[in-house]
Amino acid sequence: MHPTTLMYTSSLLLMFAVLLYPLLVTFTSLPLNNDWASSHAKTAVKSAFLISLAPLSLFLSTGMEAVTSSWTWMVTTTLDITLSFKFDHYSIIFIPIALYVTWSILEFATWYMHSDPLMNRFFKYLLTFLVAMLILVSANNLFQLFIGWEGVGIMSFLLIGWWHGRADANTAALQAVLYNRVGDIGLILGMAWLATNVNSWDIQQMFILSKNLDMTLPLLGLILAATGKSAQFGLHPWLPAAMEGPTPVSALLHSSTMVVAGIFLLIRMSPLMENNQTALTLCLCLGALTTMFTATCALTQNDIKKIVAFSTSSQLGLMMVTIGLNQPQLAFLHICTHAFFKAMLFLCSGSVIHSLNDEQDIRKMGGLHHLAPFTSSCLTVGSLALTGTPFLAGFFSKDAIIEALNTSHVNAWALTLTLIATSFTAIYSLRVIFFVTMGTPRFLPLSPINENNPAVINPLKRLAWGSIFGGLLVMLNINLFKTPVLTMPAELKLAALAVSILGLLTALELATLTSKQFKVTPLRTPHHFSTSLGFVPAIIHRQIPQLSLLLGQKIASQMVDQTWLEKTGPKAIANATTPLASATSNMQQGLIKTYLTLFLMTLVLVTLISTT
Amino acid sequence: MTPTHFTISSAFLLGMMGLAFHRTHLLSALLCLEAMMLALFIALSLWSLQLDATGCSTAPMLMLAFSACEASAGLALLVATARTHGTDHMQALNLLQC
């Protein structure tokens, strides 16, 4: 085996071994010591990150990609499935970033979940999730990817419902499972079509063998899978509801890793989508609608975690738009940079929430710039990176996407929506910073504001370095697959920056109006639309069960059971015959003697007449 | 009318008059019913003898079987009447007539 491939494969094997060892320790019946979480789990992830830097550096210096097929899992007459790992540009760059972010989140979680008696179980769940995510990202065939896909779905369910005594948490976990399941139908449709038409689930074989086939149906299935897992419009309500889980869960699953799994699937399958204009247009319009709708919903939320969740959803829509522009690598870049600043935003939220004694409403925060300076600074850096401030992490990916959007022959409506959503990003980011860090405190005086724990400071510091330099580092070291358009009118080049600054100025103006009564009777309808999340959860979560129950009642019970099997069958005979029988018996009065006498007399008459 | 024809017809008619003009007991009506059946049996038996028609030889047996069923049904009704009304007097059966 070539030494580079050997290095890749052995690094991945070592990573899995390092990550699985703490989990295997928990399966023995020995009781865990109290700091198992920090001594074993966090150290395992840190070691795995350092191990993953080896393939990364090798890839950056040689640019070599590899595919490893090892153990033959199943051999059927037509389909072979082997354990197969793909070390390409996407997985080699994503795995270190995911491990870096997870390391920071686990260290933060040792502080955040310190008072939880089941903290070790929490870390076990997070580690299991991480292993499933790595399986998903490094999979070379769809079967292995599906294993990772389902794994992250289940761990998401378990982690969202962590505080399962709370009914809202259980509802949110159920929503996550149901919406992901609808997406899984699409994935299974795609897999079934590919297995029956292309006869393989290996990525390389699929790409070659599907050159001349019409791939619309499996691509629609894969887009449905991405809609479910990455919370695109239509299957999006689970993502804001998933904020019921603890903040480390939100930071890891629902900002950096799990929700990008759907986009990652589409990026892996992008060669199939290159020539299919239907699929590309669908991705574009769906992504544009998602990013606009969720940015609108984020404008008026009052829970800090919900604002960040909608921000995640909006950025996922932007990634979907990028895929619709046939630029999968830019979407991947956005995944990588987004992981840094979004995880940091969630960790800052977690620090603020714990500091204010579990207060999550931004209307009851304020003035934290002086009281928790480090957290506020990280919040500001993260928000600036999110809005695409030049030369921070988000700029390199987001600006590249907007430029590609502006210079391609694309749906003008999708373009408009994306630009408006970009300006909304600036608006709600400023709203968060204004309410949380600026102004005067609106919380109780005796709040345990303490950010001096190194378990809080170090993760935030690491992610802040990532948010500032991550984009630059990634961009400097990769080769772009598609040549970007480098010449465009100045207005298009500055479009992203211009709309963000416009949004920022609007938000500043609105922020100064919070202490003045601008309108005597405010316009409440758009506010209600935005706060109630577009009424989508309120309508859909009631309408669909009601339709199902009505269907059950009308068709199963009333139509089949009562009508066909009772009234038109056995009871019909009884209901038709009973009136006849009662009429007949009412007519006969029972005067037998009279009847018989008359009968006799007529008989005698007949006899006499016949004989004479 | 031949004497045989007259005899059987008059036997049948007499039985029917007894059935129609019964006064008190249901049992006497049932006995007259049996008499009618007997007359019909004799008539059917003489039919094949007088007309030399061997094809109708089985008719009397069938007739007898059905009359036995009918007699048993009548007796069951008599027993049921005796159980519900206490007697088999004919006046008792008309009590609840509307």
UniProtKB/Swiss-Prot annotation, chain B:
Its biological purpose: Core subunit of the mitochondrial membrane respiratory chain NADH dehydrogenase (Complex I) which catalyzes electron transfer from NADH through the respiratory chain, using ubiquinone as an electron acceptor. Part of the enzyme membrane arm which is embedded in the lipid bilayer and involved in proton translocation.
EC number assigned by the record: 7.1.1.2
Keyword terms: Electron transport, Membrane, Mitochondrion, NAD, Respiratory chain, Translocase, Transmembrane, Transmembrane helix, Transport, Ubiquinone
Record PANTHER family: NADH-UBIQUINONE OXIDOREDUCTASE CHAIN 4L, NADH-UBIQUINONE OXIDOREDUCTASE SUBUNIT ND4L
Localization per Swiss-Prot or TrEMBL: Mitochondrion membrane
Chain's gene name: MT-ND4L
Transmembrane region(s): 1-21, 26-46, 59-79
Official protein name in the record: NADH-ubiquinone oxidoreductase chain 4L
Enzymatic reactions: a ubiquinone + NADH + 5 H(+)(in) = a ubiquinol + NAD(+) + 4 H(+)(out)
Source species, domain of life: Eukaryota
GO BP terms in the entry: ATP synthesis coupled electron transport
GO cellular component entries: mitochondrial membrane; respiratory chain complex I
Membrane topology according to the record: Multi-pass membrane protein
Record has Cytoplasm as a keyword: no
InterPro entries (alphabetical): NADH_UbQ_OxRdtase_chain4L/K (IPR001133), NUOK/Mnh_C1-like (IPR039428)
GO terms assigned for molecular function: NADH dehydrogenase (ubiquinone) activity
UniProt family annotation: Belongs to the complex I subunit 4L family.
Coiled-coil region(s): none
